[in-house]
Amino acid sequence: MHPEIRKFLSRVLLLTMVSSMSFAAVVERRKDQFGRDFAYYIFPIAGEIPGMGKATGLGVTLSNMAGGDSDFTGYYVRGDIKATGLALLDYHVLPQRLIFDVGYNDYMVSTTSYNSGSNSDPHNVIYPRIEGNYLLGQLTLTFDERRYEMFARALNGRNRVKEILDKDNHAFAGVDTSWDSGIYYSLGGSLDLTDDRLDPRTGARFEFSSRLPHRRRADESEYYVNDYNLTGYAPMRKWDTLVFNLFYSHAHVTREGVTDYATLQQSYGLNCNQYPVGPDQDSCFSAEANLLASKLDNNRYGSASPLGGTQRLRSYDNGRFYAGQALFYGVEYRWNLTDERTPFNIYLAKGIRTGIQLAAFWERGMVANESSQLFKYPRESYGVGFRMILSGVIIRFDLAKGQEGSQSQLFITYPWSMFSVDNPG
């Protein structure tokens, strides 16, 4: 491992240990972490995920059902993104000790696919149209008001590429449209020494996850991915919070796949010789070269968790930057305009509003296949956001700007999460 990366991770570990000792005896939960206030929301959805597009639809959420902590949520959206989802969350197998989550999603999306690396050309892209579905389940063992947790996670899914368009929106013929399926397992945990899991204002949180090796095809590599996420919360003024986030992801190849270009071309090529010699064939060969280069990199180094989208580097498309390693750090100031518990009960919603918030943020991220190259091409985002904190859910709207332009997004939960709907892990 590169000395600079080793030094960096050592400092993260030291900071985590110091945070644990410092906050464990000081930070008290400011409210019950197992919700009891029943709430429901029937709400229109007008969302946007950078690099995937916009969608509208309808969502339903029931929080703290039957006087307990369990939630149900469902959604239906259509537009650039076609998706349907259902989830049962925080079902207590053993009260306040063993918690079960399960969810199902199906989707059809037109993604934007770039070359790997921080310095990849933003104009050199292809647009795969992908459909699929997955069933996701998680068991969480929790202690001490959810301060200490371990989880096991399984995702059973399948997907296929329906078509691939070039940058001029011309479809390539001869694309493999067969279904791929598999089961993916993750193990992880968290140390949450904050005053509240949903809306923390002071303390620190450390999360880790390991996605276990899996491959769907004989020519693919097997590798596992370790993610580390450290977030600190410093109280400012009366209700405000200054938030710091540090994230590192590393893929470790355990069994290398095919790294011969000609062999991969036979399996994943775009059949460019069907086009007559000229611009169309040149465009096809260019797109094919990029596609195969990504396959080669993935087989040699694996793919760590990507940057870009709703969680990190918010001014870039979803999954914009990817490689064998990823490093991210950012800071966000959250102005809490109110600090209240205001009940509301209207025809389509009932619950408790606990805050309205403005935010300003700055982020920097980088990816590379080798540690020595990781700090070579950093990318930055900055912007502002608006949030509404309700009982059991946070709705946020962010505007972000970076080297490749601006993005807006309407999403749920705070940024810098380990998992999200657009990146379920």
Q: Where are the regions a protein language model picked out?
A:
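Sequence/structural signature of outer-membrane beta-barrel proteins
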Residues: 63-67, 77-83, 107-111, 157-161, ...
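Outer-membrane beta-barrel initiation region
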Residues: 24-103, 151, 175-201, 304-314, ...
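Transmembrane beta-barrel strands of outer-membrane/channel proteins
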Residues: 46-48, 58-60, 72-78, 100-110, ...
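C-terminal outer-membrane beta-barrel translocator/porin domains of Gram-negative envelope proteins
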Residues: 198-351
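Residue-level signature of outer-membrane beta-barrel architecture
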Residues: 48, 62-64, 90-92, 139-145, ...
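Outer-membrane beta-barrel "beta-signal"
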Residues: 187, 386-392, 406-425
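Membrane-embedded beta-strands of outer-membrane beta-barrel proteins
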Residues: 58-60, 74, 86-88, 137-139, ...
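Transmembrane beta-strand segments of outer-membrane beta-barrel domains in Gram-negative
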Residues: 28, 110-256, 272
